[in-house]
From Swiss-Prot:
The encoding gene: Acd
Biased amino acid composition, Low complexity: 296-309
Pfam families cross-referenced by the UniProt entry: TPP1 (PF10341)
Compartments it resides in: Nucleus; Chromosome, Telomere
One example of a Gene Ontology biological process annotation: segmentation
Function field: Component of the shelterin complex (telosome) that is involved in the regulation of telomere length and protection. Shelterin associates with arrays of double-stranded TTAGGG repeats added by telomerase and protects chromosome ends. Without its protective activity, telomeres are no longer hidden from the DNA damage surveillance and chromosome ends are inappropriately processed by DNA repair pathways. Promotes binding of POT1 to single-stranded telomeric DNA. Modulates the inhibitory effects of POT1 on telomere elongation.
Motif PWI, residue numbers: 11-13
Protein name listed in UniProt: Adrenocortical dysplasia protein homolog
Region of interest called Disordered, as start-end residue ranges on this chain: 237-309
Region (Interaction with POT1): 156-245
PANTHER family, alphabetized: ADRENOCORTICAL DYSPLASIA PROTEIN ACD, ADRENOCORTICAL DYSPLASIA PROTEIN HOMOLOG
Gene3D superfamilies, sorted: 2.40.50.960
Amino acid sequence: MSNSGRLVLRPWIRELILGSETLSSPQAGHLLKVLQDSETPGPSSAPDTPDTGAVLLVSDGTHSVRCVVTRNAIDTSDWEEKEFGFRGTEGRLLLLQACGLRIQVAQDYAPAEFYLQVDRFNLLPTEQPRVQVTGCNQDSDVQKKLNKCLEDHLSESASSSAGLTLSQLLDEVKEDGDHRGALVRLAESCLVLQGPFTARPLTHWATSCSQATEEAVFTVPSFLLHISENEEQILSSIDSSQKAQENPASPSLMPQEESGASVSLLSALPTSDPGQKDNSQPPPTVCSTSPRAQAPSSTPCSSTPSSPLLTCSPSLSPLRHAPTSYQACETRTQFHKLEFRELQWPIKRRQLLPRTGAQEPHSVWEPPERHRDTSAFQYKYGTPSASLHTQVQTARLSPQLVAWALNIVMESELPQV
C-alpha cells in the first residue's frame, strides 16, 4: 500500500502460466472489463439450461488474462451485490482464491489462447483507475508453451481415434460392399415387371450403318432418276442419227438435219481456194443454232484471213406436244439453222517467222482493254497461251448433250397450265 492509499499489484499471471499453472495462495487482480455478465436463472428457466457464469478481463498491473467465473463460484461467494451481476464493477479489485489454467482450442473466429477458470473469488470494495496492459498470450514464452500444448493435444486426439486396425477397416468396407450389392439386386428385381427382355438381332443394314458413322451419305431424289417418254423418244432419235453419221459418204452430202444436231463451239472450216495453200488456215468461226430461215444463196460458213470471230445465239420456240419420230426429224430440220453475228474483237496481226517467212499456225487473241460502252476493265487479264487456244478450237459438244439441252430449254418455255 502506498502513501496515497493506492494498492500496488504484484505481477503473477505470467509466472502462473509458465510455472505451476495453479494458485498456491490467493492473488489480487484489477477488474478491467466485463466481457460477459452472468445471468441469474429464474423460475421460468429450464433446469438443464447450461450457465457459464461471467467472463472478466483481469490485470495484475503488467499483463491481463481472461477469467471465466463459474456459476458455482458466484453462488458461494460473499459478494453482497451478486444478484445484480458484474456490470458497474469495472475498476474494483478482485481477489482470486482458487483458479486453474485452461487452454481454448481455436474454433470459428476465436483464436487459441490460455485463460483462467475461477472456482472461488471475492470482490473487494477498493476501486482504482483502470490502466490498459498487454495480454499474456502475446508474450513470446507464453506463445511457445501454447504451441507445445496444442501439439500434445492433437497427438492425443489422433491416438485416441486410431482404435480400428487395418483388417477391421477392410472388414467394414467388405460389409458395406455386400450390403450395396444386395440393394442393387433388390432394385433390379423390382424393375423387371414383365419378365426378361430379349433384344432383337441387328440386321445387316443396321450393322453397316452403325459401323459407317464417319462416311458421308448422299441421297438423290427419285424424280431426277426417272426418264420421261419424251426424253426416251429424243434419245432414240439421237442414237439413230449418230449411227448414220459414223460412216458418211461425203461431208458435203450430209443431211442438213443431222449436220445441225452436232454443233461445235469453235469449228474450223478450211477453204478449198488453191491460192491459199501456202498460207496458214483462216481463223475459226463460231456457229450455233437459230430458228431463222437462211437464204439459199448464202454460204453456211465462209471466212477470210482478216475476218473476226463469228458467233450466234439460239432462239427456240416452245414445244407444244411430244413429237413423233417423223416430226422430230422435221423439227430438227426446221430449228437447226445457222446464223452468224460478228463480234468486234481486235485480233493481233499474224507475224511472219524470221527465217521461213511462214505465218504462225494460230492467231494470238488479246483480251480487250475496255467494255463496249468504252468503260475500262476493272481487272487486267493476261494473254491466253497457245495450248489453251488449241484446246478451245478442238472442243466439241456431243449430239446427245445438245439434244438434252435443247429439250430442257424448250420444256422451260412451255406455258404453265
